[in-house]
Swiss-Prot record:
Recorded family membership: Belongs to the universal ribosomal protein uS3 family.
Entry protein name: Small ribosomal subunit protein uS3
NCBIfam families for this protein: rpsC_bact
An annotated GO BP: translation
MF terms (GO), sorted A to Z: mRNA binding; rRNA binding; structural constituent of ribosome
Keywords: Ribonucleoprotein, Ribosomal protein, RNA-binding, rRNA-binding
Cellular component, GO annotation: cytosolic small ribosomal subunit
Sequence intervals crossing the membrane: none
PANTHER family linked to this entry: 30S/40S RIBOSOMAL PROTEIN S3, SMALL RIBOSOMAL SUBUNIT PROTEIN US3C
Length: 220
């Protein structure tokens, strides 16, 4: 089952945290969930070239706190904070609530699966060979300190008549190990032959349990 399920969702509550942190009753839950989706689509659409990895949302009363994780914080903030202020105003109008935006910088973009996937997708759109794009991405990620990476592209590769999927990997990616810090990201490339899907798994090492389990391990 570990081969099929989303590796991030499988680890939520174990070593990963939720991207949306709020509570709502049955009456409001669906509306707030759709609002979260609209916020993420708006942010990702507006900051398409800013290497945005994820958008975290927290709610308190009539206030929405949004944390944008990006490899290019300067592009998100803009000159004198103009871009982030324009984004905040547009989100205020979209939600009808007070919106506060935090920017979190991603120090190593090559270890972020979403950004690696987007990088490959952009190269495919620029007619670079999918094999070359994947192998270069693998080299950069392993050089950045990853323990393993698995890549997959699927669609009409190289303009072929029949769609297929191709995989490349290096190192280990233990999908069944819950303490393994595995990042997963997807992207789509719009080519002249149609869409090509990109999936990336990056294994960044094990996250050790934080609660006192050493005694139990020593006892065994």
């Amino acid at each position: 089952m570990g081969q099929k399920v989303n590796p991030v969702g499988l680890r939520v509550g174990v070593i990963r945290d939720w991207d949306s942190k709020w509570y709502a009753g049955k009456k409001d839950y669906a509306d707030l969930l759709h609002e979260d989706i609209a916020i993420r689509e708006h942010v990702e659409g507006r900051l398409k070239d800013a290497s945005v990895s994820k958008v975290e949302i927290e709610r308190a009363a009539n206030r929405v706190n949004i944390t944008i994780s990006t490899a290019k914080p300067g592009m998100v903030i803009g000159k004198g904070g103009s871009e982030v202020e324009a984004l905040r105003k547009s989100l205020n109008e979209l939600t009808g609530k007070r919106v506060h935006i935090n920017i979190s910088e991603i120090k190593q973009a090559d270890l972020d699966a979403k950004l690696v996937a987007e990088n490959i997708a952009r190269q495919l759109e620029n007619r670079i060979s999918f094999r070359r794009a994947m192998k270069q991405a693998i080299q950069r990620t392993m050089r950045a300190g990853a323990k393993g990476i698995k890549t997959q592209v699927s669609g009409r590769l190289g303009g072929a008549d029949i769609a297929r999927a191709e995989h490349y990997s290096e190192g280990t990616v233990p999908l069944h190990t819950l303490r393994a810090d595995i990042d997963y990201g997807t992207a789509e490339a719009d080519t002249t032959y149609g869409k090509i899907g990109v999936k990336i798994w990056v294994y960044r090492g094990e996250v050790l349990p934080t609660k006192g389990t050493n005694k139990e391990e020593g006892g065994n």
